[in-house]
Amino acid sequence: YGWLHLAGFDLPMEEIRNFRQLHSKTPGHPEYMETPGVECTPGPLGQGVGNAVGMAIAGKMAAAHFNTEEHEIFNHQVIVLAGDGCLQEGVAAEAASLAGHLALDNLTLIYDSNDVTLDAMADASQSESVFDRFAAYGFNCILIEDGHDLQAIADALAQARAQNEKPTFIEV
């Protein structure tokens, strides 16, 4: 919700303070048509990754059908933000594997690796390196050591946009 606020959507700080409160614009799971800037309702953890992969596939299909040498109409990047709990779900793993297989270079996944899930530390249910898992899926993987380094994040996003061979995974 912070990103939506900073991007200028109608999401004032008062709404952010009402996070997870009944009738707020900031429910526990983002909801399409309830929160400005939310393009789909992701529902259970991991589903947002599947939604993003679907959007990236749709973008590729639209580009193949409508783009010409004179007019590149569809050239957008799909960006998904995911946490530890999201990437522990099977739907996220399956969708990410497909994204790597299809070399969806219009997809960037930003992973907030704070080692916290909804009700426990991530190591209570996960022991593998998520970074290495996404490398195995075929992603271009970038590690940002300091999540407060905005220039490093901007540089990683620019690198993701510039490469045209595979999806990008940015661990923050």
Regions flagged by a language model, labelled:
Residues 1-101:
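Cofactor-binding active-site loop characterized by glycine-rich and histidine/acidic residues
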Residues 101-103, 135, 164:
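Anion (oxyanion) recognition and catalysis
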Residues 76, 104-107, 137:
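Short glycine-/polar-rich loops that comprise or flank the Walker A/P-loop
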Residues 83, 111-114:
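Cofactor-binding loop segments of dinucleotide-utilizing enzymes, especially the Rossmann-like FAD-
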Residues 89-112, 169-171:
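A short alpha/beta connector and helix-capping loop motif
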Residues 67-74, 115-117, 121-159:
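Conserved thiamine diphosphate
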Residues 161, 167-172:
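Terminal amphipathic helices with adjacent charged low-complexity linkers/tails
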